[in-house]
Amino acid sequence: VTVTTTRSDVVVVGGGPAGGTAAYELARRGLDVVVLEKEKLPRCKVCAGGLTLKTVQLLDFDLTSVYESAITRGKCTFKGRSPVVFDFGEVVGWTVMRDKFDYLILQEAATAGAQVLDGEKVRGIESQSTGAIVRTPGGEFRCSVVIGADGANGVVARSSGLRGQRRAAVALETEMEAPPDVLEARLGCVHFDFGSVPRGYGWVFPKKEVLSVGVGSFWGRATSLKASLFSLMELLGLRCDPSQVKARGHLVPLGGVDRVLHKGRVLLAGDAAGLAEPLTGEGIYYAVRSAKIAADVIYRALRHGTGDLSSYSAQINAEITRDLRYARRLAGLLYRLPRLSYRFFVTSPMGQSGMADVIYGRSSFEQLCGDLLKNAPRLLLSALR
């Protein structure tokens, strides 16, 4: 068997938003970058596909070709009832199909000079003092740095000894065909339902031709999720034939705990680093942000000839994990006491505007927690009425 050897500055394992963004940022600075994606591209990915405004602002290329629906409204219900509708009066985000969105980022990375290889399943990595070797069935890729952006069960974290104990949410989702009038009615509006999923929530995100309907549990078991999904669809009047529903499940590794995310010449980004937001499970923003931090650290390390990645973990913990710790506290309250929390948090103007500010990127979870704590007696009294 002939083993081909490829040499580069950086090998990125995984072609999702974290891997694609890191490859783009490094390639445009002149580094020699190879992306290894195990699936054939463009590949299907289970995800509600919500892009917040702050995520779009992090990416400096045009995404309009992959937008499905511009989001201007939000709706929250409790077990299908007690609706609270938000009219933002402006676009606060977009929905996308993940196969198209992820592929667009990889195409931008390729245009910037990265080599994108699909159908390349990484078997393992070997870290060395001055670099690393990434092995696939077809060959080995020698490089100065490896970025593990290969998701919740990534091989890079396992191979490098960076896979610590993590808490993960479990999500189940389907892309549901709906009549034109139903699609039209839901266009521009993201819908969240609380109380119908044990220790979690359900959602409906509009796309051009389908609705993304899903459920996620932050402390639950995957076994009950299918029943929760059908129950949610019934509650919301989304009729379907259960035998025709193709639901896909996935893990959402939650952030909010300081971790070591680098070792030698290897670092982790996105879901591989366990950086999803623990209140909603939002992962794309943190994937992109961690990838940009990774690219900065790697570029500096290679430019200075040190290969020292030690500032990466400290930066992620300070700039991302610290705030996710507050989201984790809010999630603990919201999902343990869903009915009270719905009235305390979702129906209160302070909770609404505070959460909107976090989504916009104007505020943080730390700020939101501080405001809610300061006004807790008044909000609680109002919620108990």
Say what each PLM segment does:
Residues 3-16:
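Beta1/beta-strand and adjacent pyrophosphate-binding region of the FAD-binding site
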Residues 10-12, 33, 266:
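Conserved hydrophobic helix-helix packing surfaces used for dimerization/oligomerization
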Residues 19-20:
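N-terminal Rossmann-fold NAD(P) dinucleotide-binding loop
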Residues 24-46:
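Glycine-rich FAD pyrophosphate-binding loop
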Residues 29, 108-242:
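Predominantly flavin-linked oxidoreductase catalytic cores and closely associated redox partners
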Residues 53-104:
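A conserved beta-strand/loop capping segment in the N-terminal third of enzymes
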Residues 124, 140, 221-298:
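FAD/FMN-dependent oxidoreductases across multiple families
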Residues 296-385:
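C-terminal helical "tail/cap" subdomain of flavin- and related membrane-associated enzymes
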